[in-house]
Design a protein with these regions (language model features):
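Divalent metal-dependent phosphoesterase catalytic cores across multiple superfamilies
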Residues: 3-111, 117-135, 202
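Active-site-proximal beta-strand elements of phosphoester/diester hydrolases
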Residues: 34-47, 143-153, 186-188, 236-240
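Divalent metal-coordination and catalytic microenvironments
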Residues: 42, 76, 81, 113, ...
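The substrate-binding groove and active-site-proximal loops of carbohydrate-active enzymes
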Residues: 43-50, 79-88, 151-165, 191-194
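Catalytic metal-binding/acid-base residues of hydrolase active sites
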Residues: 44, 82-83, 115-116, 192-193, ...
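Conserved acidic residues
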Residues: 74, 185, 213
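Extended active-site neighborhood of metal-dependent phosphoesterases/phosphodiesterases
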Residues: 87-179, 199-214, 225-260
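Short acidic, glycine-rich surface-loop motifs adjacent to enzyme active sites
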Residues: 176-195
Length: 260
């Protein structure tokens, strides 16, 4: 977006029905053989005090890393839980957090987590989508294809599970048909994938033809790297959080530092 590093790759459809036209100007980028992807887990901003910490600690440290990267292109993505649950429907508060995120020195992509949703609504992430855009999207950088997916499924006001809807599986299938299997495939979602989740078999089957597949996730407030046998081996990176132990200290639940 203009004046912000938050990536604006979409246009909102008007509420009224009928035909609508949106024009996009595409600019060809040079092929980046090397780049740095900075992953931020769970900022989970819950107050103005924690927003200041996120700005002065996390964002400042990220910008220092970018500054030290020289000519290496940098990108950032948040794995969701950008806000605490009591703020997910506060438009002004979301705008404040978005402004802080937009102060980074490189493009910033965003996905949603369970705390970014209003489980009591039919469309549980209306405010988050109004602020940041689509919840499922993809993009290419260099030789990698990145796919961002919402994998939080609420069943009522409090209970949620992990997985993907039939519509998401269909969308992912169509998306991957356009991608060479020689590309590195990176799937970014909020919750790590475990032994069981909705549409597990259909999801794994779509990834088997790719030579190298990674999953980036957050959610657990600790760091974990595991190999998933799907039967193809897929490397899952679970990232520690910006908020650590919910902004109560400067460490995550497993003792690793707050950060990215």
């Amino acid at each position: 977006e203009e004046g912000s590093s938050i990536v604006k790759f979409y246009e909102k459809l008007p509420a009224e029905q009928g035909e609508h036209r949106q024009d996009f100007i595409l600019e060809k980028k040079s092929y980046e053989t090397r780049f740095r992807m900075i992953v931020v887990g769970d900022p989970q901003v819950k107050s103005m005090a924690s927003l200041e910490r996120f700005k002065n600690e996390t964002i400042t440290a990220i910008n220092e890393t970018i500054g030290k990267s020289g000519n290496l292109p940098c990108y950032i993505i948040s794995t969701g839980d950008n806000f605490e649950s009591n703020h997910h429907d506060d438009g002004l508060y979301l705008a404040n957090v978005k402004e802080v995120m937009g102060g980074t020195l490189c493009p910033f992509f965003v996905i949603n987590g369970n705390h970014d949703k209003d489980a009591g609504k039919g469309d549980a992430a209306t405010e988050h989508k109004d602020c940041f855009g689509p919840m499922n999207y993809s993009f290419n950088i260099g030789g990698a294809h990145f796919v961002c997916l919402d994998n939080i499924r609420f069943s009522n006001d409090t209970d949620y599970s992990t997985g993907f809807t039939d519509a998401q599986i269909e969308w992912l299938e169509q998306d991957l048909k356009t991608v060479s299997t020689s590309r590195i495939l990176v799937l970014i979602m909020h919750a790590p994938l475990r032994s069981n989740f909705t549409n597990k078999d259909a999801f794994w089957s779509l990834l088997q033809s790719f030579g190298e597949v990674h999953i980036f996730a957050g959610h657990t407030h600790d760091n974990e790297n595991v190999t998933l046998k799907t039967p193809k081996e897929i490397y899952q990176h679970v990232h520690g959080t910006a908020c650590g132990a919910w902004w109560k200290s400067d460490i995550c639940a497993d003792g690793t530092p707050n950060g990215y």
